[in-house]
């Protein structure tokens, strides 16, 4: 649709060389637009917003292999450049089957000239079963989702991506066995406005411009926080207490500096359209450094 065409044009204007998209949300006209502008398209296969029984799909050899065949066939049918796996609800008992799925999928993607990437949380003990080290052996890129340190359902207000969280996610992924040249770190183009009222914590995710507008409209003073490497602000509005750790040029630059020092393969972001235009000059400088 027209929104997707705008995304394609914006991606090219900003120098984006790869876009990850759900096939259900991108029509053939959009794919043609991407191809004509020289932008690689990786189809994302995700369990987010879907009630998928991953164990039922991945735990039976015949079902898993049929799933692999279907994924690769779809990618080839739409003339895509790669497949991105974004499974965020893998249970510990499903871990071995998940890793085996990636092994089998990688054989077919490589045989058909497709790039295979896998999204991962920043490592914690509770996600060790994702098998990052094994992933690093078989896939082309391991993507660390370097955000959602404090996510939408959190009952504690905090940064979406403090610098220690970002660097820790990168370094623990490398320590798990993923080579830096295979690691892509994803940065947030969004922030959260946290509201505490009556002892209840809630939040709203906003893009950079919308967050800055909220700060200006409410007269919130922003102060650089050396701990998170972000500007922080707070305000009492009505009967509620608001807090924000904002993403902008300086916070993004700090994240890119950490990525450069760890020699990772590149940068991804969630999501295109949430960023300020000025962010791209910082990303260009990182890419060309």
Regions found by a protein language model. Give the residues of each.
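Catalytic domains of carbohydrate-active enzymes, especially glycoside hydrolases
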Residues: 3-26, 71-83, 254-268
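Substrate-binding surface in catalytic domains of secreted glycosidases
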Residues: 69, 91-215
